[in-house]
Each structure stands twice: as C-alpha cells, then as structure tokens.
Amino acid sequence: MTSVSYRFLFGLGLATAAGLASSQPVRTDPLAPLPPGSVRPQVTSTTRAAPASLAAQINAIGRGFNGIVGVSVVSLRDNWQADYNATRLFPQQSCSKLWVAVAAMDAVDKGRVSLNDKVTLGRSDLTLFHQPIRSKVLGGGHTTTLGSLLFTAITQSDNTANDKLMRSIGGPEAVRNMIEAKNLGSIRFYDGERALQSRIAGLIWSQSYSIGDAFYKARSALPTSVRKASFERYIRDPYDGAAPRAVAEGLARLQKGELLSPGSTRRLLSIMASTKTGGLRVRAALKPGWEWSHKTGTGQNFQGRIGGINDIGILTAPDGTAYAMAIMTIPNKSDGGAQELMREVTKAVIANHEARRGG
C-alpha cells in the first residue's frame, strides 16, 4: 500500500467556551478566532422568555445528556425562545447543506442561476461517505439540473450533489457571503465535504479517496495520535461550527420569508419536508398532524465518540403554529442517546403547545 500523506493541524485558536445552560437568551459570549470568510456573531432582537415549564424541561434534558448538547427553540407565533447551551459552536456536519441550499435559492432569486440549469458530474466531482449519486456518475457521467442537485443534497444528504451545487453557485465563498449578507450570525461554513472530512480525520484530500473504501483505508493507516489530535481539535473549534441559537433564528427567518422570495421559501421548506434521513430523531417523536421540515447532520466516529449528531428544522403544529428548532450534540457514546434526547425535546415542545392551545 502506498504511504499516506498526513499532517498535524495546528494554530486554530482556543476552544469556544460553552454557554451556560439557560432558558434566557444570553447575547454575548467569547468566541475563538474565526477562519477567513467566516462571520462574527451578530446581536439579534430580544425575544420573550419561554414558558417556564418548557424551559425547565429542556434544561433537565440537556443536563442529563452523556456528552455536549445545545438546544434552541423559537416560537414564531409567540416570539419566545428557549435555549440550552445555545451559544457554543457545534459541528454542523451535513446541516451545513441547508446554507448551500439557501445560497442557491438566493442566487435564483437574484437571477444569477436557474434551478433548470444543466450540470454534468464526472469522477472528479465525487466526494466521500454518503453519495447515492455516485453510481450514476460512475456509469459514464451524469447530467442533471441544479434543482435536482439541491433536492438530492437536502433530502438524501448526498455529499457529491451538495458540493457540485456549491461549486456551481460560486463555491464556499458564495455561501459565506450569503451568511454574512443576511446577518445570520454565529454560523461558519467550510470548504465542502472533501476538505472538511479529510481535515477532521487528519488527512490531506486526494481524489483517489472518493472511490471504494480508499478514504477509510487511508484514515485507518494514520497513527492514532494523529487522528485523536485532529478529531479533538475539530470538536473544540469546529471549522463548520454553528451556535444552535443562530441556527434556530436563521430557520425562523427562513420560515417568515426574510431570507428568500416567497416562492423560493415555499420550495425550500417543501424540499426540507421531504428529507429521508434522521428517522429516529425528531421525526420519530411527532404526533399525528405535526410536520417536520429539516436537515440532519452526522459526524465521524472516533473511538465511540461522534463528531456531531444534529437535527435542525421547522416543527409545525396541526393548527399552523411553527417552531424553529436546532438540536446539536456531541455524544460521548454512539448508543442512541442523541436521538433519544431529540425525541424528548420534541415531545416537550409538543406537550407545551397542546397544554397552551388545547391540543
């Protein structure tokens, strides 16, 4: 086997301090230095205090978790916000595909691209991990539309579809510019799945990793000390990090039509409602008539610790009341505890809604 190139990743600044568990918004917290093109947290409008019983439940759920968790829930109707450790930066993983989609729809709104624009994917576009589109690409190339890439990236969390969409609208900088222009706050965006995942592992990306199990073999060939240092550095200061509060507030603005045109807003939320991933997360706790338009994210597993298990989206009650929710976790064990926590938070939000609105 050929030797594997790897590097130690130094100089990324201090870890972001974890926010204190609180049901009240805290508007300032120290953040690590941001990478070029990233955005400093912005001050947002103050919301009302969340219902005390719900805030207490979310705090109790968060404190009982085996790992690190951040939760933010925003009621769009009543303008309250319930937070737990919601200013800490958490790994987004595939949740960052949402911002690629928003940037793409924003480009559509500005007339820069059309969702009907054709694109062709070849072997050089392949990424790693989950990429269902790979079989079509390996069959001699695959021509599709930007709209199809967006749908596949969100609903199936396809890494290759996402990265091709990102490059088609201007690359990582276009996404970062959108985040900054729309004042989304404490949300970072890295350079796509290939760059992100290889850096987390302690590797330098090679396109050969996109085929078969080459990435896994290269990662396994690294000294454990390299993998551990790279993984822990990412957990401390994630290159794609986002604060649950910023994510929930961004989702609330999306739902309210503040980020995109009415047509693009409806289309993106409809696509998010078709998401197939995360069946054991928030969706598993829904009661009849409730809807969940969302994006999931799952990180790499190193010695049983997961670099992010997340579910973010818009929870809608049968009466139309909408809640923006961001639940972001770094579990100490891959034992299903993160998924259970998400279900418990969802049940608490639904129970609070039913108690206050009569079911």
Describe the function of each predicted region.
Residues 24-61, 167, 172, 232, ...:
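Structured C-terminal helix/loop/strand segments within mature extracytoplasmic catalytic/sensor domains
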Residues 26-204:
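Active-site-adjacent loops and short helices of periplasmic peptidoglycan-processing enzymes
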Residues 1-10:
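Bacterial N-terminal signal peptides that target proteins for export
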Residues 154-157, 226-230, 320:
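Short, flexible turn/loop "capping" segments at secondary-structure junctions
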Residues 187-263:
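Active-site-proximal helix/loop microenvironment
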